[in-house]
């Protein structure tokens, strides 16, 4: 039975890791809006050309362009047995457009899967990340610190905190997520399509919780 999933969750919730595991377990494509944009732009599709013209002018790509890209992607053969949408929909307008498109095809989303993680937990998780600028090795000052304080275990370079991981930046991203996504969460809750998973668990436990929701008979 096909399984169609919308994946929701704040930055730092581990969506990418879980998306990969879900895709493998259920043999469905992991569809991210970033990948769709890059593919359309690199292949110079009409939608890609239109999107690029907005981006080149420093403008936001209109919802309709994004929606049409997603519609095209969902009609490809590898989506016949379901798919995992990551990064779409971002707004209630996009969710309604997706609903209308699926209704026309006599289909619907099976679940909107929310990986829920408290803000304090994400702040600790993201602001503690460190990376080696020389070899790319990743660390965490609490959960996976380098053996020698501040030095990469592999090459000895000083590890750094990326700009994206500073407390100010993380808080800004979380505020944007909250303001943008709460109406979307309410939308799926009202449609009784929302499933919530505790994202503070260990990675394998989060995945086990997801499988219980989706059914693990694949």
From Swiss-Prot:
Entry's EC annotation: 2.7.4.3
Entry keyword set: ATP-binding, Cytoplasm, Kinase, Metal-binding, Nucleotide biosynthesis, Nucleotide-binding, Transferase, Zinc
Record GO terms (molecular function): adenylate kinase activity; ATP binding; zinc ion binding
GO cellular component, one term: cytoplasm
Pfam families per UniProt: ADK, ADK_lid
Compartments (UniProt record): Cytoplasm
Annotated binding of Zn(2+), by residue: 132, 135, 152, 155
Pathway listed: Purine metabolism; AMP biosynthesis via salvage pathway; AMP from ADP: step 1/1
Disulfide bonds listed in the record: none
UniProt region (LID), positions on chain: 128-165
Catalysed reactions, as listed in the record: AMP + ATP = 2 ADP
GO biological process: AMP salvage
Positions bound to AMP: 33, 38, 59-61, 87-90, 94, 162, 173
Principal place of residence: cytoplasm
Residues annotated for ATP binding in this entry: 12-17, 129, 138-139, 201
Region (NMP): 32-61
Job description of the protein: Catalyzes the reversible transfer of the terminal phosphate group between ATP and AMP. Plays an important role in cellular energy homeostasis and in adenine nucleotide metabolism.
Quaternary organization: Monomer.
Similarity comment: Belongs to the adenylate kinase family.
Domain comment as written in the entry: Consists of three domains, a large central CORE domain and two small peripheral domains, NMPbind and LID, which undergo movements during catalysis. The LID domain closes over the site of phosphoryl transfer upon ATP binding. Assembling and dissambling the active center during each catalytic cycle provides an effective means to prevent ATP hydrolysis. Some bacteria have evolved a zinc-coordinating structure that stabilizes the LID domain.
Name assigned to this protein: Adenylate kinase
Organism listed in the record: Clostridium perfringens (strain 13 / Type A)
Record lineage: Bacteria, Bacillati, Bacillota, Clostridia, Eubacteriales
């Amino acid at each position: 039975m096909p399984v169609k999933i919308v994946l929701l969750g704040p930055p730092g919730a581990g969506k990418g890791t879980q998306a990969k595991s879900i895709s493998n377990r259920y043999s469905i494509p992991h569809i991210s809006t970033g990948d769709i944009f890059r593919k359309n732009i690199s292949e110079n599709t009409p939608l890609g050309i239109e999107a690029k013209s907005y981006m080149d002018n420093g403008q936001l790509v209109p919802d309709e362009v994004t929606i049409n890209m997603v519609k095209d992607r969902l009609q490809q053969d590898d989506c016949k047995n379901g798919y995992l949408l990551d990064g779409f929909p971002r707004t209630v307008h996009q969710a309604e457009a997706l609903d209308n498109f699926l209704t026309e095809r006599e289909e619907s989303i099976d679940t909107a899967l929310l990986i829920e993680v408290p803000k304090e937990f994400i702040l600790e998780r993201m602001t503690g990340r460190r990376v080696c600028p020389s070899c790319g090795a990743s660390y965490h000052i609490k959960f996976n610190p380098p053996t020698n304080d501040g030095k990469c275990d592999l090459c000895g370079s000083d590890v750094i905190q990326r700009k994206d991981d500073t407390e100010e930046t993380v808080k800004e991203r979380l505020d944007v997520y909250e303001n943008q996504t709460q109406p979307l969460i309410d939308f799926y809750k009202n449609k009784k399509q929302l499933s919530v998973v505790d994202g503070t668990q260990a990675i394998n436990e989060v995945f086990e919780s997801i499988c219980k929701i989706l059914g693990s008979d694949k």
